Every structure is written in structure tokens, then in C-alpha cells.
A protein has these predicted regions:
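N-terminal pre-Walker A segment at the start of P-loop NTPase domains
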Residues: 2-17
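Walker A (P-loop) phosphate-binding motif
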Residues: 13-53
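Solvent-exposed alpha-helices and their adjacent loops that cap or buttress functional pockets
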Residues: 22-26, 124, 128-134, 168-174, ...
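Residue-level preference for the first positions of well-ordered beta-strands
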Residues: 28-32, 56-58, 136-140, 177-181, ...
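General beta-strand structural signal in soluble alpha/beta enzymes
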Residues: 33, 58-62, 140-143, 180-184, ...
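Short, glycine/acidic-enriched capping/hinge loops at junctions between secondary-structure elements
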Residues: 43-45, 68-72, 151-152, 222
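N-terminal phosphate/diphosphate-binding loop that engages ATP/GTP or pyrophosphate donors
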Residues: 47-139, 143
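Conserved catalytic-core segment of NTP-binding enzymes
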Residues: 114, 149-165, 174, 179, ...
Length: 310
């Protein structure tokens, strides 16, 4: 039996959009995404949905992420890139050691520019004239660009800076809703992870925290599909080459030092189980076992499923 109070939803983007847009007028929702196996795809997909709904999405990672691409392609191409976890946005704003207020003022100027910004990914001037917002934008904020092979990375902002940006935006009373999307940890493209002592970097102002797991981790050796496998093996009390079971995955997702560590008490906690389409019919029981293992005291408020067959 499923635990009362847990909602299982398959249309995950629509559900998250509903939760974000249910916030009162003037409130700037903040979503933090943690875990592995689809964080970047979630952020990219949400930014597209926000734009379609007339809202401005502000990607403000608190960790390093791959550099997004300019939103100069067609909506169809942007959607395809999002499904690959590649973010496309209108502009990049870098803090580069400046004060939080300076970054906030630049952000306000961009959000309130009548003609929007050029559809190219370049740091904007530190000073811009403030007019009225005319269209929804997707912006990316970060500290600095770090050269990295094969793709450069963007070093994120501190959780404290992100919360100060949120407070600043709420005082501005923008005519379009702005939503902060925070990628709060990295997983080196693995579908599951064990979190180190400094992770995740969840802002104290987060309204929603979504912990992501890729279901393609189930049944495979821990050493090959888990980010920081040694740490995971230690926490689980298994060998490095033990196959990942549903109970093991649930233990990592709900561990006190796992993806929800540092979540504000007022925030809604959501688990997103990604890639349901990778499970063949004979593995359907694995998903059922994982859902049951997540339905425990202290478990998530909601479980969302995603995959081409969901």
C-alpha cells in the first residue's frame, strides 16, 4: 500500500509549473534541483515551459554547470536540446566579484528592458536603462566562466547570494513572474549519487526541492552508475560492485546526508524518478519496490515519474 499523503504524478513538468505558479503574487518562487540523472534536463525543460507561460526563468546554479547555449535556435531545436540536458537562454550575467547589489541592479535592468536583450550569450553591460518588461526572458546567472574541456563551465553563485537576489526581485514587483531555478549539485552525468559533506548547496529561501534519480541505475554495479561510489558503498554497507537495488537507491535518496540535506522546513520535497522508459516489462517490479521504499516516515511529499512511456 502507498503511504497516504504521497502523490505520484506522471506529467512532471506540468505539476512543477503548477506548484511554482501557485505562489502568491509578488513572490519569486525558488526551485532547487539536486541528485543525478536529469537535473540539467529538468532545468532546461522548465525554462522553456516558463517562457511559453509568459514567465521569466532565471537559472542561478549554486554549483558548476556546463555553459548554456544562446537561444538563437527554433523552439523545436531548443526543446530537443533541453531533452539532452543542454540549456538555451537569452543572456548570461556574471557577478565576477562584484557586490550582490550590483548583480541585482543589472538583473533588474535586463528584466525591465523594453526590447529584451540580444539573443546571444554574452555578458551584458553593467549598467542598462530600466524600462518596462515586454517579454519573458530566460537568463543565466553565475560568478564566472571556467575554461574546461571539452565545454566551458559556469561557476555558480553562493546560496546566500541567490536568496538576496530573490529578496531584491520581490521588492521590484515586476509585471511578469520571475522564477529562480537552482541546480544545487553535480553528478558527473551519473544516474545516482552519494552526496559529499559540502553538498547539496540548497538556498535557505527555496520553496521546492526536487531530488532527481535516473532509473537506469537499477540493477547495475554501484561502481559504474553512482557518483562517488566509495562513499555510497560505505553508507549502504555493500561492495563497490554490488548491483543497485530499489532499497539501496531509496536509502541514498532519503539519507540524512543526501539530496535533501539543508532543505528549508517550509519547502516542499519532491523526488523525480527519471527515465521510466529504460525499464523493460520484466523490470516493472523494480519501480514498484522503489516507490514502496520511498513511502516511509520522513519521505518526500510527492513522487514524480518521467519517461517516454510515462
Amino acid at each position: 500500500m502507498l503511504r497516504a499523503g504521497v502523490i505520484i504524478v506522471q506529467q512532471f513538468l506540468s505539476r512543477i509549473m503548477d506548484l511554482l505558479c501557485a505562489c502568491p503574487p509578488g513572490h519569486v518562487p525558488c526551485l532547487a534541483v539536486t541528485g543525478a540523472g536529469g537535473k540539467s534536463s529538468l532545468a532546461a525543460g522548465l525554462s522553456i515551459h516558463l517562457s511559453k507561460a509568459g514567465h521569466s526563468g532565471i537559472i542561478a546554479p549554486s554549483t558548476r554547470i556546463y555553459m548554456p547555449r544562446p537561444r538563437s535556435c527554433s523552439p523545436e531545436e531548443a526543446q530537443r536540446l533541453a531533452e539532452c540536458g543542454i540549456q538555451t537562454c537569452d543572456a548570461l550575467l556574471l557577478r565576477r566579484g562584484r557586490s550582490d547589489r550590483a548583480l541585482s541592479e543589472e538583473l533588474r535592468a535586463v528584466l525591465c528592458t523594453m526590447d529584451g536583450v540580444p539573443r546571444r550569450l554574452l555578458p551584458l553591460p553593467e549598467k542598462s536603462s530600466a524600462l518596462c518588461p515586454n517579454r519573458a526572458l530566460c537568463l543565466v546567472l553565475g560568478e564566472e566562466v571556467v575554461r574546461h574541456s571539452p565545454r566551458s563551465k559556469l561557476r555558480g553563485l553562493s546560496p546566500e547570494t541567490i536568496c538576496r537576489l530573490k529578496q531584491f526581485l520581490e521588492k521590484e514587483k515586476l509585471s511578469r513572474r520571475a522564477v529562480l531555478l537552482v541546480e544545487a549539485d553535480g553528478a558527473a552525468r551519473h544516474p545516482l549519487k552519494a552526496h559529499a559533506a559540502h553538498e547539496p548547496q540548497i538556498p535557505s529561501c527555496a520553496d521546492l526541492v526536487v531530488a532527481v534519480m535516473g532509473l537506469d541505475a537499477l540493477g547495475k554495479p554501484l561502481a559504474t552508475v553512482v557518483h562517488r561510489p566509495e562513499l555510497a558503498a560505505e553508507r549502504l554497507g555493500v561492495t563497490l560492485y554490488a548491483p543497485v537495488t530499489p532499497r539501496m537507491a531509496a536509502t541514498l535518496l532519503l539519507h540524512e546526508e543526501g539530496p535533501f540535506r539543508g532543505t528549508p522546513s517550509s519547502a516542499r520535497r519532491i523526488v523525480l524518478l527519471n527515465k521510466t522508459d529504460v525499464l523493460d516489462p520484466s523490470q516493472g517490479k523494480l519501480l514498484d519496490e522503489l516507490l514502496e521504499s520511498l513511502h516511509v516516515p520522513g519521505g518526500p511529499d510527492e513522487i514524480l515519474l518521467h519517461g517516454n512511456n510515462a
